[in-house]
């Protein structure tokens, strides 16, 4: 399944605000589609599916990528759900977004793909690159790279930055000091793990 490239307004009307995907919001409370205004109690499967879709669209993943992350998380000691969130939050494109160096994860992914980002002074062009505590994020010493990120930093996608990250706006650098606290992620990871467990 490919990455979604359709109308994001339909997605946020169906799933709610997804800051990683877009800054756009909608004032319409009904879901898209012919029967969007009809109230019906969702099944347990529908609830788990919706939470999975929230996570997938927010982080900009294909179904295949998300399934691989779930399998990796299951091999990590401890809570599978928390391990899944930590894997996703430590993706380079997400770290760039959380630092305010890009307004959305797709914008952060573009920065990485185009070679604007360095990790520990080495240029990294893989958005899914797994960062770790202690990593330093910087911007390539090129006028275009610096200009893009300076502009983005004036209008960050999120109002607050998680405690495990720090940003130096003057030098356009960021640092990862640890692992994100669970409370910063507005998703129910247990429902997502249950969804894949029941699918076998």
UniProtKB/Swiss-Prot annotation:
* Keywords linked to the UniProt accession: Chloroplast, Plastid, Ribonucleoprotein, Ribosomal protein, RNA-binding, rRNA-binding
Q: Which Pfam families match?
A: Ribosomal_S4, S4
Q: Where is this region: Disordered?
A: 20-42
- Give the UniProt record's GO annotations in the biological process aspect: ribosomal small subunit biogenesis; translation
| GO terms of molecular function | rRNA binding; structural constituent of ribosome
List locations, semicolon-separated. Answer: Plastid, Chloroplast
- Coarse class of the primary localization is plastid
Q: A Gene Ontology CC term for this entry?
A: chloroplast
Task: Give the matching InterPro entries.
Answer: Ribosomal_uS4, Ribosomal_uS4_bac-type, Ribosomal_uS4_CS, Ribosomal_uS4_N, S4_RNA-bd, S4_RNA-bd_sf
* Bias type Polar residues, positions: 23-37
What PANTHER family does the database record attribute to this sequence?
A: 30S 40S RIBOSOMAL PROTEIN, SMALL RIBOSOMAL SUBUNIT PROTEIN US4M
The family assignment reads:
Belongs to the universal ribosomal protein uS4 family.
Q: What's the protein called, per UniProt?
A: Small ribosomal subunit protein uS4c
The organism is Guillardia theta (Cryptophyte)
Task: From the UniProt record, report the name of the gene that encodes this protein.
Answer: rps4
């Amino acid at each position: 399944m490919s990455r979604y490239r359709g109308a994001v307004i339909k997605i946020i009307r169906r799933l709610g605000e997804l800051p990683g995907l877009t800054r756009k919001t909608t004032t319409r409370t009904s879901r898209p589609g012919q029967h969007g205004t009809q109230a019906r109690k969702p099944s347990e499967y529908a609830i788990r599916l919706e939470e999975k879709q929230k996570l997938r669209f927010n982080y900009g993943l294909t179904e295949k990528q998300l399934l691989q992350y779930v399998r990796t998380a299951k091999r990590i000691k401890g809570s599978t759900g928390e391990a899944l969130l930590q894997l996703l939050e430590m993706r380079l494109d997400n770290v760039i977004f959380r630092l305010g160096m890009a307004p959305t994860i797709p914008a952060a992914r573009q920065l990485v793909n185009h070679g604007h980002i360095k990790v520990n002074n080495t240029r990294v062009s893989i958005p899914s690159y797994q960062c770790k505590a202690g990593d330093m994020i910087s911007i390539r010493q090129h006028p275009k790279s610096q200009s893009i990120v300076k502009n983005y930093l004036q209008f960050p996608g999120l109002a607050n930055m998680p405690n495990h990250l720090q940003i130096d706006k003057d030098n356009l650098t960021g640092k990862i000091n640890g692992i994100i606290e669970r409370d910063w992620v507005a998703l129910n990871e247990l429902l997502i793990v249950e969804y894949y467990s029941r699918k076998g």
